[in-house]
Amino acid sequence: MENSLGGGTQPPRSDKEKMIRGSAWMTAGSVFSRILGAIYVIPWRIWLGAAFLTANALFTKGYQIYSLFLIISTAGVPGAVSKQVARYNAMGEYKTGMRLFYHGTFAMFIMGILSCGAMWLLAPLLAAGDARMIPVFRSLAWPLLLIPSLSLIRGFFQGYNEMAPSAISQFIEQVARILYMLVMTYAIMVAGNHDYLNAVVHSTFAAFIGAVFGLGLLVVYFVRQKPRLDTLVAQSKQALNISVNEILVDVARQAIPFI
């Protein structure tokens, strides 16, 4: 049975076509995101002016710690979920894949709460005596609330050979992050009180804004595909007797080597 969630009026695509199409989407999303990431620095640097070097140092230090939390909470999850969902689909066990989606998303949301709380509470310790870093770290705690769930949903769609949702959501996430970052930096440094620390805090908080938009797009896509998913679930063989814990442990085993 066709595992892709493509339009109902379109003929099924071959594995080769799906692979090429998926690679094209992921490559395009990555290229556009990198281009945006390179361009935004120019106006950001200009508007920060003489405070740029200090602001950039705070920004970079914040993201270094944030990246560690991100690796711990999400590393390997999209690939592991994609592999498991594809395996269940190949077996005709679509219902098991949906169980993974629902319970996995909840588990990753709990992971997000724990990661967010840990970074928020540890901010004074992580700041190592630099009080300016505390609000920077805490602004970066917020995206940790959403990104674990976001990564699992992307992996779920990849398991159906649907790369477009991941690529487009990553692009939208990047656009929203950069727009918020630049708008707030301009409002503070050009039209406001020139508080560079406040500009940095909003620049790092922009990661949360991006995550909201990226997650929102994936939720919309999921709702639109729900009827097709329900049809596949109704056709599920249901011959696989596996508990929720076993499903999640299998995903963890796939993901942990990537950490």
Language-model regions: role of each:
Residues 129-153:
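Alpha-helical transmembrane segments of multi-pass membrane proteins
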